[in-house]
Amino acid sequence: MTKLKTISYLSPNLFWFYQEVVQAIARRCDCHIELIAANCDPLDDCLLNQDKIDIAFICGLPLIRHNRIAKQPLEILAVPVMQGDRYQQQPIYFADIVVHADSNFYEFSDLAGSRFCYNDRGSNSGYNLLRYQLLQHLQSLFPSQTLPANYQFFRLSQASGSHQNSLQWIASGLADCAAIDSIVMAVELRQFPELAQSLRIIESIPSRIPPITISSRLYNQLGGGFVKEMRQSLLDPDVSLQKAMELAEVSLYTTASINDYAEIGMFYDQGISANFNIL
């Protein structure tokens, strides 16, 4: 029996759903799939770097950065489309800029001099998208000029370690703002509805949703027909996966190209070329 190794680099609050996804693939393809939760950044993971991962649930930014240096790049198997009007039946999610409900922050410019927290610097929703937004904001303030040396928009920036921690920091007053993965936030508010009373979204930045990816090696190793069946298990889910998708508020799975994620890489590159960090 074919055995596949799968890893999730995404938030653990939907790990149960990723288990349902890989089980659906296993049923359709008559294979065994082991799913593990990552304990390090994808770019630091020797298993991924040595092409020992077959399937990966991964954020768009580390996907792009990994593929720039990988001998065997990752390819997109399928992408989820979330339920809810804000997602417009498109494979997108948002970096929701969250503040305390009782704060005096109402728009992005109000955040100057505030305390910012982020899950980690490798995160698209938690760091990359907000950095790009901030860079655009500062360039509008200083047109045709380089940013002043050692310019700081935020009074303080701290790594919280996770989106969940960032939400708790804001609710408890340890931080003023954070950019939060909209899917992670929705799950947290379903699990802890009382948290919603302490939080408010002042702006949302759309981006391509984290995809399910496979090593390009699988085409030669298992054949294009096998990969097609893997993909079909998501595009045409069985009853068991449909039930899990409903609980996870996933409307459907669809196809996507790695080129759809180029904008994420462009935002990252602009932040790097400007030598700009949120500090």
Regions found by a protein language model. Give the residues of each.
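Periplasmic-binding protein-like
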Residues: 78-94, 193-231, 246-259
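Acidic, polar ligand-binding/catalytic clefts
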Residues: 47-110
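A ligand-binding cleft/hinge motif common to bilobed small-molecule-binding domains
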Residues: 57-71, 135-136, 169-172, 176-196
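A short beta-strand-loop structural module common to alpha/beta enzyme folds
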Residues: 31-41
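Short loop/turn segments at beta->alpha junctions
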Residues: 39-40, 59, 162, 181
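Segments of small-molecule ligand-sensing domains
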Residues: 33, 225-279
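Bilobed "Venus flytrap"/periplasmic-binding protein-like clamshell domains
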Residues: 2-28, 38, 89-166, 241-251, ...
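Short, hydrophobic alpha-helical packing/hinge segments within bilobed ligand-binding/sensory domains
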Residues: 43-47, 53, 63, 163-169, ...
